[in-house]
């Protein structure tokens, strides 16, 4: 995945220099990570297929993920760096950290960042937290995250592995929300209804 991102930004002089700097001195990422927006721009990544805005990769997203992937650090150092960049970053930087997690050798030691993102009301962070690394969320936290997506209007297509993880407990939670909305004459999203049906079928 990171090779694909680097290829999409091939020819970007800033990223080439930044990558070399990070490979030579991992501490350089402290200043280069925030600068990716200026260095590579914030436009959609070249060649990015059309899709929901919350799942679209931007050039600065890709550049930051590439920089993280090029860090040559032992796991403990990498985990500490990832936490620091997330803690000190703005929303765009935090989203990039979350998007990078599936491709970093951090085990489950950054799962707390998912919990932090899921406590926010920023749909970009919530969506990024539910990518492949969300496999480290325990079932209860994952179900609550899916429910939060429905409340926030975040498309459930952003939830990695929802077809595999949907279960009876999620079906019960979604059905309860569906009933509440029906009683209040409020719409229940089509994608949530599809996941509810899938969860009911998988638990039958």
Where are these regions (language model features)?
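N-terminal alpha-helical scaffold/docking segments in eukaryotic complex subunits
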Residues: 1-74, 141-204
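Eukaryote-skewed repeat-based solenoidal scaffolds used as protein-protein interaction platforms
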Residues: 63, 67-173
């Amino acid at each position: 995945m990171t090779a694909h991102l680097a290829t999409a930004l091939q020819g970007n002089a800033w990223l080439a220099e930044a990558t070399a700097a990070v490979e030579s001195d991992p501490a350089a990422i402290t200043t280069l990570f925030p600068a990716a927006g200026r260095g590579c721009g914030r436009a959609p990544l070249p060649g990015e297929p059309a899709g929901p805005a919350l799942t679209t990769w931007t050039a600065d997203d890709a550049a930051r993920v590439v920089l993280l992937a090029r860090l040559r650090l032992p796991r403990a150092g990498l985990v500490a760096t990832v936490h620091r960049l997330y803690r000190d970053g703005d929303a765009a930087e935090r989203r990039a950290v979350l998007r990078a997690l599936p491709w970093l050798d951090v085990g489950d030691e950054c799962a707390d960042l998912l919990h932090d993102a899921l406590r926010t009301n920023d749909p970009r962070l919530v969506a990024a937290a539910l990518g492949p690394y969300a496999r480290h969320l325990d079932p209860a936290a994952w179900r609550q995250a899916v429910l939060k997506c429905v409340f926030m209007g975040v498309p459930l297509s952003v939830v990695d592995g929802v077809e595999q993880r949907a279960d009876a407990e999620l079906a019960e939670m979604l059905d309860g929300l569906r009933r509440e909305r029906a009683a209040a004459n409020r719409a229940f999203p089509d994608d949530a209804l599809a996941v509810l049906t899938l969860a009911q079928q998988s638990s039958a």
